[in-house]
């Protein structure tokens, strides 16, 4: 990391400030990646006063807040409804996805992995037992094989209720990978031949003794976030209520983030100043268009020495 992050103290002169609100968000990841998200409408720009109606800044709509008298507090309080519960569940799902997204950007991941559980060795229908075995195994690998190991994994449940995990790992040290003789083509595995040898080799993690394992090398780090977040579903959130929905090693820190409210006429000059402060070029861009919000994602990467191919 090159010194401090200059964008933490710059660009405040571009616009007015609203606490918690932003239409540009800048994120600095541990692996030297900078991300700029540009929103078509401000995020979190909602004001709620003492009345039951609150204006929503970016649409001009009004949101009605239902109130009821609470005899225990002698105050008018928000009435929770079925709609509130559904919204809460959706928000929980989105928060989990957002957390996994940001941590999945924090490392230069080397392998996608899938680990299953053998019913003769583990009660594969017991969430706590399966996740405990997996988490302990990763921590043991850090102690014995790869002291700098980074991992991020999420559980997934088979239709029959059995659990397995999907994840990514990096800085694998002396961990052992055995060539399975197969390659990954899309979502399927095929025996390697002269015809398909250019596809990703499927390895097995030799140290995983609780079931079956696969590992394939990451070829596009910008697809890691999409790969790992797709396993976070409504069904998973319901079946793991009150439990952890993802696991990460302690050496994956929180990224550094800052939000700005920038007036439309200042976007170009803001972006120029911001990118100049990074000192690196853009490597990836995508746009996501929604009914009420559109977001442009831009990624910039510091130059770093490539790891030697093993």
What are these regions (language model features)?
Residues 1-161, 172-310:
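Right-hand nucleic-acid polymerase module
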Residues 164:
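Calcium-binding loop positions in Ca2+-binding modules
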């Amino acid at each position: 990391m090159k010194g401090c992050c200059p964008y933490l103290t710059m660009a405040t002169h571009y616009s007015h400030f609203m606490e918690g609100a932003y239409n540009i968000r800048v994120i600095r990841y541990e692996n030297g990646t900078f991300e700029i998200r540009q929103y078509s409408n401000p995020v979190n720009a909602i004001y709620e006063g003492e009345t039951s109606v609150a204006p929503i800044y970016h649409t001009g709509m009004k949101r009605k807040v239902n109130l009821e008298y609470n005899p225990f507090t002698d105050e008018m309080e928000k009435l929770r409804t079925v709609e509130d519960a559904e919204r809460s569940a959706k928000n929980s799902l989105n928060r989990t996805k957002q957390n996994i997204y940001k941590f999945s950007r924090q490392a230069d991941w080397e392998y996608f992995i899938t680990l299953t559980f053998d019913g003769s060795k583990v009660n594969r229908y017991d969430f706590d037992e399966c996740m405990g075995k997996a988490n302990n195994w990763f921590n043991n690998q850090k102690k014995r094989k790869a002291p700098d190991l980074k991992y991020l994994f999420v559980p997934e449940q088979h239709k029959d209720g059995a659990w397995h995990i999907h994840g990514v790992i990096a800085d694998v040290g002396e961990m052992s990978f055995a060539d399975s003789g197969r390659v990954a083509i899309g979502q399927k595995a095929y025996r390697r031949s002269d015809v398909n040898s250019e596809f990703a080799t499927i390895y097995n993690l030799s140290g995983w003794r609780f079931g079956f394992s696969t590992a394939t090398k990451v070829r596009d780090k910008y697809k890691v976030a999409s790969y790992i977040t797709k396993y976070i579903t409504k069904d998973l959130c319901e079946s793991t209520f009150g439990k952890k929905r993802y696991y990460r090693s302690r050496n994956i820190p929180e990224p550094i983030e800052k939000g700005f409210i920038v007036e439309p006429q200042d976007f170009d000059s803001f972006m120029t100043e911001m990118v100049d402060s990074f000192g690196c070029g853009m490597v990836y861009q995508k746009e996501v268009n929604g009914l009420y919000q559109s977001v442009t994602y831009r990624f910039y990467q510091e130059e770093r020495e490539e790891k030697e191919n093993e």
